[in-house]
């Protein structure tokens, strides 16, 4: 998909005789209605001529060549106008790398870099890959979706998002079944019913500290017919994960805004058993894990809201507010 901006002068091309007759009848009726209303209101002169310009016959509407209207045209075809096939996603010349979604919960800035809190309680201490790029100046924790580059660099790209898409993605990662369909399931089903399939999601650029992403669809049975949609990264990544399609990141963005893991928290140890990781957190034994309790409350609240159990969702919300207030007072 491309955008052409510029002044375009609409020109009238003479249609078939039948179409011209029909157009003349419709234009005449509209013109008479405007004329009668203007007379009833006591308006004449320039108002009537303006009406003839817009509702008159084609020859009258375009008699003055001085009228230039700005038009924004968008188009998509098998060539997209530049000789490259629409299915060729690399026609822009940018390089992209594949990435995978990590089970991250939040991102916060510290004095010596950044800390990414994972779903299992693990804290990843990171530094910027490109120190010249300044980001996230405040130290407050932010909900984030973290992508890991699969090109061997192991760079992490955190994307700050709202709480709901972050929790929805974590639920999908953990295979938590939600009885009622989410908006991402609806988009997936609508796409399939229209005869298209999701093929790719890309993080394309960063403008004013905001990431831009595109969702690529292809016609089932005709891969040359494609559609590209502009979406928020949080929505695009959620859709891509549910459709099991690649998530790619602009290599320049990954290098400039990516983070490198410097070292894990020293007090953490891992034991692999039945393909699960158990983490001993940096806290005394037999003490409550506030992060796990907070996550359970948020998850229960969202699940209740999706299932339309609004009374239960309100109760979980109140419990979450009280829990966070208590946690804040303990700090």
Curated annotation (Swiss-Prot):
One GO CC annotation: VCB complex
UniProt keyword annotations, A-Z: Hydrolase, Nuclease, Nucleus
GO molecular function: nuclease activity
Localization of this protein: Nucleus
Induction section of the entry: Up-regulated by abscisic acid, etephon, salicylic acid and methyl jasmonate.
Domain UVR: from-to ranges: 291-326
Nucleus among keywords: yes
EC number: 3.1.-.-
Main localization of the protein described in the UniProt heading: nucleus
Family: Belongs to the bifunctional nuclease family.
PANTHER family reported in the protein's UniProt record: BIFUNCTIONAL NUCLEASE 1 (PTHR15160:SF13), VON HIPPEL-LINDAU PROTEIN (PTHR15160)
Function: Bifunctional nuclease with both RNase and DNase activities. Involved in basal defense response. Participates in abscisic acid-derived callose deposition following infection by a necrotrophic pathogen.
Name the UniProt record assigns to this protein: Bifunctional nuclease 1
Organism listed in the record: Oryza sativa subsp. japonica
